[in-house]
């Protein structure tokens, strides 16, 4: 069952965070349970809003919970595709200076997203979905001019987008799409004279009711709980 049917909720319906306190997101290989107020709030916002920002340090469950919600949405046919985005500029590296084709260049930057998908769906199934472009890897530079309809979009490490790049991602969202934008404002690898797109958009849009923002902290690290799905007891 998807999380909405489990809770008898619908997208856009307001509910208390307490309603999410013991909820598991069920995926074929793992059941994922949010722990702590911030993770529960984050899950609530992902399921009730079209655009959500998760901000905070690594290890707080931002990526894993977003991928779990995306897998749930895909398997329950609320979206047609998953689109994975991660800035390919980190610690001074750019795509053009990395060896290999586009897929090989982008894949290392998406490893945390792939790892989460493999845990929930298995490597073979993920690879088949990638081949069919049901799961799509979308480098920022290749989003220009596109409209992403009926997609669940996840952008990781968004602190390393520029203002223009962040605007481009947000304006790619089309009909029936949802986006979760994650980042850590203490880990910006952009040149010092360039403003982080994440920092900028949070300052501009933080009070917009239709947008969800969850701020994580060190107390959220390692709180995430997973258990094998009854459908997959292979360990």
Regions found by a protein language model. Give the residues of each.
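Interdomain "pre-motor" coupling segment immediately N-terminal to P-loop NTPase/helicase cores
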Residues: 1-18
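Pre-Walker A adenine-sensing motif
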Residues: 37-45
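Hydrophobic anchor at the beta1->P-loop junction of P-loop NTPases
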Residues: 54
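Conserved glycine(s) of the Walker
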Residues: 61
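Conserved P-loop NTPase nucleotide-binding/switch module
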Residues: 88, 93-99, 161, 165-199
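Conserved RecA-like ASCE ATPase "motif II neighborhood" in helicase/translocase motors
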Residues: 135-152, 162-166
């Amino acid at each position: 069952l998807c999380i909405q049917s489990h809770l008898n909720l619908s997208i856009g319906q307001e509910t208390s965070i307490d309603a999410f306190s013991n909820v598991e997101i069920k995926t074929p290989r793992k059941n994922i349970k949010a722990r702590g107020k911030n993770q529960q709030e984050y899950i609530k916002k992902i399921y009730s809003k079209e655009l959500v920002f998760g901000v905070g340090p690594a290890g707080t469950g931002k990526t894993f919970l977003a991928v779990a919600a995306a897998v749930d949405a895909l398997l329950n046919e609320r979206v047609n595709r998953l689109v994975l985005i991660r800035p390919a500029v980190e610690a001074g590296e750019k795509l053009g200076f990395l060896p290999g084709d586009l897929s090989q260049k982008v894949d290392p930057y998406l490893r945390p997203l792939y790892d989460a998908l493999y845990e929930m769906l298995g490597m073979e199934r993920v690879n088949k979905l990638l081949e069919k472009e049901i799961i799509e890897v979308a480098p920022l530079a290749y989003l220009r001019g596109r409209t992403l309809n009926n997609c669940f979009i996840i952008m990781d490490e968004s602190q390393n987008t520029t203002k223009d790049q962040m605007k481009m991602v947000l304006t790619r969202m089309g009909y029936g799409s949802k986006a979760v934008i994650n980042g850590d404002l203490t880990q910006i690898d952009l040149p010092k004279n360039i403003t982080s797109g994440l920092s900028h958009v949070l300052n501009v849009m933080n009070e917009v009711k239709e947008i969800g923002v969850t701020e994580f902290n060190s107390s959220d690290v390692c709180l995430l709980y997973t258990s094998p799905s009854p459908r997959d007891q292979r360990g």
